[in-house]
Curated annotation (Swiss-Prot):
Pfam families for this protein: Ribosomal_S9
Example GO molecular function: structural constituent of ribosome
Recorded name of the encoding gene: rpsI
HAMAP family per record: Ribosomal_uS9_B (MF_00532_B)
Organism the protein comes from: Vibrio campbellii (strain ATCC BAA-1116)
Name under which the protein is recorded: Small ribosomal subunit protein uS9
Length: 130
């Protein structure tokens, strides 16, 4: 690994992202595609950029990301978590700011399992009195 390269792993739902940060001009590459190309929805793009905008390093760092599993929303969340961890490795003094915004905490919510005798996790079959 390069000396001036920082790494962070992010997870959300069933997605996992590996994020590499290098000093640069603000390029974001996700699975060999640009941010705008990879995420069609503006909300997903916004989620990915949140930690960088918070610490005002959007134009100073290049990001190289590989992400697997899950859907669009889960992948965006995983990338955000990975960026946050990589930023803390880059500069530990950013931790309190990122913590206050709630980016350091891994969002543990995931899909609830389907139970036997039910149609979904909690949806019961229709009840008939007669």
């Amino acid at each position: 690994m390069a000396e001036n390269q920082y790494y962070g792993t992010g997870r959300r739902k069933s997605s996992a992202a590996r994020v590499f940060i290098k000093p640069g001009s603000g390029n974001i590459v996700i699975n060999k595609r640009s941010l705008d190309e990879y995420f069609g929805r503006p909300t997903s793009r916004m989620v990915v950029k949140q930690p960088l905008e918070l610490v005002e390093l959007t134009e100073k760092l290049d990001l190289y990301v590989t992400v697997k599993g899950g859907g669009i929303s889960g992948q965006a969340g995983a990338i955000r978590h990975g960026i946050t961890r990589a930023l803390m490795e880059y500069d530990e003094s950013l931790r309190p700011t990122l913590r206050a915004a709630g980016y350091v905490t891994r969002d543990a919510r995931c899909v609830e399992r389907k139970k036997v005798g039910l149609r979904k996790a909690r949806r019961r079959p229709q009840f008939s009195k007669r």
